[in-house]
Amino acid sequence: MDQTTRTVQAQKHIALVAHDHCKTSLMQWVAIHKEKLQHHILYATGTTGHLVQRATGLPVTAMMSGPMGGDQQVGALISEGRIDLLIFFWDPLNAVPHDPDVKALLRLATVWNIPVATNRTTADFIIHSPLFDRQVEIEIPDYQLYLQQRLK
């Protein structure tokens, strides 16, 4: 597929997602990085968003709970170019009923070329990157060209 570029602003739109066994770890990570994260716009799946907001006081736009469609809501935001970064602490040792949604969410993050952290170490590398607080250009699929070609 042909590519185009999208400008990711210095103020990032960050999605926070965590499986049940990882919610405490994500809340701790957000608390540690609260000073840096407060300058960005946070989104999260339902339960995670409410827990993060209560634990840190940071404003979080909460979607529905993951199993109730929240993963798909975050995926839609990624597809629309409204999420710049996904922090998703997932539990690879426990299956969840909405595993297909999890796979779809990770797939969309890859398709739309946004950074994804699936554990604390990767999240630390991302938040400490010199690009984290800067405007950057990323390559994304050229959906308009794709659509034009499909409609010929």
UniProtKB/Swiss-Prot annotation:
Pfam assignment, any one: MGS
PROSITE patterns: METHYLGLYOXAL_SYNTH, MGS
Key word Lyase present: yes
Residues involved in substrate binding: H19, K23, T45, G46, T47, T48, S65, G66, H98
InterPro entries registered for this protein in UniProt: Methylgl_synth, Methylglyoxal_synth_AS, MGS-like_dom, MGS-like_dom_sf
Enzyme Commission code: 4.2.3.3
GO cellular component labels: cytosol
Domain MGS-like per the UniProt entry, residue ranges: 5-152
Family: Belongs to the methylglyoxal synthase family.
UniProt name for this protein: Methylglyoxal synthase
